[in-house]
């Protein structure tokens, strides 16, 4: 083994540690390499003293080591290596020492200003949430200690200082430490330290940093108002001392020794001088260095006396500063500007070092006062009221040397130069709030003072609401736009606030109405204020109608602003205002809804006027069709006094109807609704233009029902559009007041537009599906009775007249045309159909007309349909059965009158029976309808147990919902068949129709047409059906026959059934006794139990079969 290798190893016994030194140098070089890419300030080089000591040891031990090598007989190769290493080591060592000494010749100079006073600091802190409060530069090093003050937003908080040495290409974060006992309840303090290490100690190098404040609420940044906090490394030129001139030593080592000796003395002096220069540059708060206000001599000559002078004048300076601050506050009535604060700090250390700076600051303060006086125009009421608000904007109102005004406040003052002081203050406050909102996302933003009296203020508030958190520069520029644009923005804003409501508000409580009314009031007031200032522009602008356009009818008391060009569309209200899940009716209403005062003022808009005030969803208690009917009557000039008395009645019935619509109405097809509404509107416009109120009954019924908005698709959208449109066009009918009070609301207002299953489940009647299937093969188009509004067959004594009104929202035009052709070419066949109650196409329409005159017979929904005046004359007098019969005869005589009881009463009863065949209660309803026609309001509740609404002209479910059209349909069907000759035929054919055989209720037939004797006769004929236990017959009999007789008969039948059912049990018991007597008790008991089980099972089967039947 070679001893030359032993020194290369890490051995504590060896004194020669040359390899270790080389390794350490390599490590230092590696550290430098690491510094360059990452700019990490962590490790520092080894001190000069340590390196020199190492060098001394190596030099002294070098000879010894060589001697040791020679003594042991080792080769001198290792010595040669040592010699080659020694030569560069000398120069390297002293270069390092030189670098180490040069680090003390660099200082950090700040390029930023700190808050001059506590008040200014707190003001900025409210906005930015974190601020650099003070800095301290460590003497003799390129390092800075800083204190950050943060707003105490949340308990958990972290403060980082992010710094970069290469213009933010790379950066790293320094975690600031909490200063103990620094919390004052509102703020906290954190400290940090930035050091510039030798590799980056270059003249002109910059250190940029900013502050990141992390809280549970959010993260906030402070970067010196967008310019970053910047430190510049500058080389400090050392000043030679007079008594110790530097010697020009020939050797580097000697020169280095001189420096080492003088470095400690110079370091203290140079560090103090450097700090003094720093105070001149930055005007920052450095507690160790104090500059005197009376400093007039040369700084170098008087440096030793500075501290004494400052201690003598401490109290004097404080008094002077207080006096100056008080004078300036009294003079300006606002806080001094940022520059004034820099000059007028309460701390003597921040007094300007030079008189020029003091004059400069005074000029800035004067500029601030001038600007504030300009802001405070002569019209300001109290200047002192602006003091607090101006604090928030003072630093932005005047120019700033550093030119770091916030972008959001830059242009407020110029834009409001001519406005009053109140306006400026209001805008300052709103802008301040915007800053707070931007800085702190937790607080809700969008504050705006609408109550201000001048327009600029309202502009600012609207801008605040619209552009929260955005760049406020653009907003303030927008303030200077034309008044007309601002007016448009404000009105748009209020329109949005009015229209953009959740769908529940369409049917909301009165609280919603109040809120909306208040909002509209505010809109009106602000609009009036606008008009007072910008009246010229506003007269040419029609946008104020927005404030009225989207308002429901419940807000009718609010009047729109009476501008010249304000034209409010009558029925073009947006459907979005009322879009909701209300019912098809609600949607349809919304399409034609307008404020009522607009409708009343505009005579030309008939459709809007008719539907406007009534159709809004919140006024559901008002019968919209009543309003339509009344307005139309007023225009036409004919009004039935009985109809006037019925207004309140129909309004009440409409409430019940609407409630059931909500419960049973199915979802509607919006596209079909809109299409049908357009068609209906066209129809209304035609009718309004022509003014023909004496149209045929079919047209009258159809147009009226269109006005009711009970269109086909909304009521019949069950996946079978054709069927639904055909069958369930106009189902909504309300019963007359003949129905007893004991009846439920569902009975009083029946919506026939239900699925067949629903109809069966909701009502005790059965509906034959064949009646509803248009493709079932029936040559009578009864299932389209309501839809076929264009075919109106009126049969007089002279013959059959055919009037067709085509293209009026027809569900199936082709089938109707076929039916029209059939009815025109085969009047006899149509008569047969009428006998069966199928051909009563126009009966519904005519019935609504006839009953319109009967106060207690039907609701006004059918009355809306324009009836011929002759029809009205028919039914006001219907009081008795005899009168009903007389009326039927009169209608036979009057060909012009297209109303109810022209035809045979038997035929009417047969029509009723047809209806009863389709649902069990129809017979009862038909009886009631007959009673309603007779106006027998005093009939017992049992007789009128079913509502008239169940009585339908046609057997289809479509007719189920037309409560008022029953007797009229009967009469109309009879009317179609020419007079009395056809009556007789109908009497004979009553039971001949196969569809009417069992379910035909003779009672209703009798009530409608025949005398009391006929009623009794037909009642006896129906007794057999009553005994059968059929619900349909029981309901019809109960409505037509005396209640006591029907009850007696039913009691007898029940008694007989009960006794019959108990006979088998009695016989079984006898058999049990016999078995027990002859056989064992257990056997008899088992046989008895088995027999009982079998009997119960059989009886249950029988009951099920009966139910099915």
Swiss-Prot record:
Subunit structure: Interacts with PPP1CC catalytic subunit of PP1, and associates with glycogen.
Segments carrying motif PP1-binding motif: 64-67
Record note on modification: Phosphorylation at Ser-48 by ISPK stimulates the dephosphorylation of glycogen synthase and phosphorylase kinase.
Membrane-spanning intervals of the chain: 1066-1086
Protein name as annotated: Protein phosphatase 1 regulatory subunit 3A
Domain notes: The CBM21 domain is known to be involved in the localization to glycogen and is characteristic of some regulatory subunit of phosphatase complexes.
Disordered as annotated region, ranges: 236-278, 340-424, 436-455, 493-517, 945-985, 1011-1048
Modified residues (Phosphothreonine): 58
Gene Ontology BP, a term: regulation of glycogen biosynthetic process
Function statement: Seems to act as a glycogen-targeting subunit for PP1. PP1 is essential for cell division, and participates in the regulation of glycogen metabolism, muscle contractility and protein synthesis. Plays an important role in glycogen synthesis but is not essential for insulin activation of glycogen synthase.
Organism annotation: Oryctolagus cuniculus (Rabbit)
Keywords: Carbohydrate metabolism, Glycogen metabolism, Membrane, Phosphoprotein, Transmembrane, Transmembrane helix
């Amino acid at each position: 083994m070679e001893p030359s290798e032993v020194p290369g190893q890490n051995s504590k016994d060896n004194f020669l540690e040359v390899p270790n030194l080389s390794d350490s140098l390599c490590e230092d070089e590696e550290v430098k390499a690491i510094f360059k890419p990452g700019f990490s300030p962590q490790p520092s080089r080894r001190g000069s003293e340590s390196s020199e000591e190492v060098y001394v040891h190596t030099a002294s031990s070098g000879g010894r080591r060589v001697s040791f090598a020679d003594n042991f007989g080792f080769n001198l190769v290792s010595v040669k290596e040592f010699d080659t290493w020694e030569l560069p080591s000398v120069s390297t060592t002293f270069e390092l020492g030189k670098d180490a000494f040069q680090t003390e010749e660099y200082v950090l100079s700040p390029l930023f200003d700190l808050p001059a006073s506590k008040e200014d600091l707190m003001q900025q802190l409210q906005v930015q949430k974190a601020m650099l409060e003070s800095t301290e530069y460590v003497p003799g090093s390129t390092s800075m200690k800083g204190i950050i003050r943060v707003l105490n937003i949340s308990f958990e908080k972290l403060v980082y200082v992010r710094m970069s040495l290469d213009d933010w290409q790379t950066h790293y974060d320094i975690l600031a430490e909490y200063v103990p006992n620094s919390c004052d309840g509102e703020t906290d303090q954190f400290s940090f330290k930035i050091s510039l290490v030798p590799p980056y100690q270059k003249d002109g190098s910059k250190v940029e940093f900013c502050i990141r404040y992390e809280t549970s609420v959010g993260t906030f940044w402070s970067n010196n108002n967008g310019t970053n906090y910047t430190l510049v490394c500058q080389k400090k030129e050392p000043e030679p001392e007079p008594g110790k001139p530097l010697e020009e030593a020939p050797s580097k080592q000697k020169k280095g020794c001189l420096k080492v000796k003088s470095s400690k003395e110079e370091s203290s002096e140079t560090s103090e001088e450097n700090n003094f220069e720093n105070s001149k540059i930055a005007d920052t708060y450095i507690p160790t260095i104090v500059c005197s206000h009376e400093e007039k001599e040369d700084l170098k000559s008087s440096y030793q006396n500075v501290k004494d002078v400052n201690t003598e004048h401490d109290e004097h300076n404080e008094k002077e500063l207080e006096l100056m601050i008080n004078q300036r506050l009294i003079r300006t009535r606002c806080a001094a500007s940022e520059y004034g604060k820099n000059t007028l700090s309460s701390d003597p250390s921040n007094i300007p070092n030079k008189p020029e700076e003091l004059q400069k600051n005074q000029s800035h303060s004067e500029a601030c006062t001038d600007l504030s006086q300009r802001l405070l125009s002569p019209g300001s009421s109290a200047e002192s009221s602006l003091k607090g608000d101006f604090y928030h904007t003072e630093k932005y109102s005047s120019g700033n040397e550093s030119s770091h005004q916030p972008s959001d406040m830059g242009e407020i003052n110029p834009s409001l130069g001519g406005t009053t002081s109140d306006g400026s203050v209001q805008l300052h406050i709103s802008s301040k709030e915007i800053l707070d909102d931007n800085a702190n996302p937790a607080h809700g933003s969008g504050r705006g003072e609408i109550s201000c009296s001048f327009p600029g203020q309202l502009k600012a508030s609207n801008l605040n609401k619209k552009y929260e958190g955005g760049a406020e520069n653009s907003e303030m520029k927008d303030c200077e736009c034309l008044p007309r644009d601002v007016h448009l923005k404000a009105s748009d804003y209020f329109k949005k606030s009015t229209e953009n409501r959740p769908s529940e508000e369409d049917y909301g409580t009165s609280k919603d109405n109040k809120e909306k009314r208040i909002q509209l009031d505010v809109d009106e007031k602000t609009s009036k204020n606008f008009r007072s200032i910008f009246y010229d522009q506003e007269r040419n602008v029609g946008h104020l109608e927005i404030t009225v356009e989207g308002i429901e009818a419940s807000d009718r008391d609010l009047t729109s602003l009476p501008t010249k060009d304000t034209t409010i569309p009558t029925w073009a209200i947006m459907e979005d205002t009322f879009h909701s899940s209300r019912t098809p009716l609600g949607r349809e209403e919304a399409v034609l809804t307008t404020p009522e005062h607009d409708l009343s003022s505009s005579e030309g808009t008939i459709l809007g006027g008719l539907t406007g005030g009534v159709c809004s969803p919140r006024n559901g208690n008002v019968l919209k069709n009543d309003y339509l009917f009344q307005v139309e009557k007023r225009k036409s000039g004919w009004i039935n006094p009985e109809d006037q008395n019925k207004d309140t009645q129909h309004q009440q019935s409409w409430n019940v109807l609407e409630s059931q619509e909500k419960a049973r109405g199915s979802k509607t097809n919006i596209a079909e609704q809109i299409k049908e509404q357009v068609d209906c509107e066209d129809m209304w416009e035609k009718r309004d233009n022509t003014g023909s109120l004496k149209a045929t009954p079919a047209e009258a019924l159809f147009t009226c029902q269109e006005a009711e908005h009970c269109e086909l698709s909304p009521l019949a959208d069950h996946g079978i559009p054709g069927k639904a449109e055909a069958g369930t066009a106009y189902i909504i009918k309300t019963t007359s007041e003949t129905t007893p009070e004991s009846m439920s609301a569902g009975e009083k207002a029946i919506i026939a537009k239900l699925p067949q299953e629903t109809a069966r489940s909701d009502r005790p009647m059965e509906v034959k599906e064949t009646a509803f299937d248009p493709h079932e093969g029936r040559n009578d188009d009864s299932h389209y009775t309501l839809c076929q509004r264009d075919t109106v067959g009126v049969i007089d004594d002279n013959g059959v007249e055919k009037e067709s009104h085509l293209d009026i929202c027809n569900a199936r035009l082709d089938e109707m045309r076929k039916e029209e052709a059939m009815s025109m070419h085969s009047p006899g066949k149509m008569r047969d159909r009428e006998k069966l109650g199928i051909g009563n196409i126009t009966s519904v329409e005519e019935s609504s007309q006839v009953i319109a005159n009967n106060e207690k017979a039907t609701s006004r929904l059918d009355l809306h349909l324009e009836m011929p005046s002759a029809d009205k004359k028919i039914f006001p007098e219907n009081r008795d059965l005899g009168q009903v019969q007389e009326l039927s005869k009169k209608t036979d005589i009057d060909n012009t009158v297209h109303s109810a009881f022209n035809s045979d009463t038997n035929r009417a009863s047969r029509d009723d029976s047809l209806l009863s065949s389709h649902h069990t209660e129809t017979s009862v309803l038909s009886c009631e309808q007959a009673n309603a026609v007779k106006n027998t309001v005093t009939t017992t509740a049992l007789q009128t147990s079913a509502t008239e609404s169940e009585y339908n002209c046609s057997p289809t479910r479509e007719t189920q919902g037309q409560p008022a059209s029953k007797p009229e349909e009967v009469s109309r069907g009879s009317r179609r068949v020419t007079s009395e000759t056809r009556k007789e035929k109908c009497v004979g054919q009553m039971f001949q129709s196969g569809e009417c055989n069992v379910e035909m209720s003779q009672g209703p037939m009798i009530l409608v047409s025949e005398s009391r004797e006929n009623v009794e006769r037909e009642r006896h004929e129906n007794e057999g059906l009553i005994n059968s236990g059929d619900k349909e017959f029981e309901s019809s009999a109960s409505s037509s026959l005396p209640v006591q007789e029907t009850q007696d008969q039913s009691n007898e039948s029940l008694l007989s059934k009960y006794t019959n059912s108990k006979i088998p049990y009695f016989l079984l018991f006898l058999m049990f006794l016999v078995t027990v007597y002859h056989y064992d008790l257990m056997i008899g008991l088992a046989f008895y139990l088995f027999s009982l089980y079998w009997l119960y099972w059989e009886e249950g089967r029988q009951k099920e079969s009966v139910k099915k039947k």
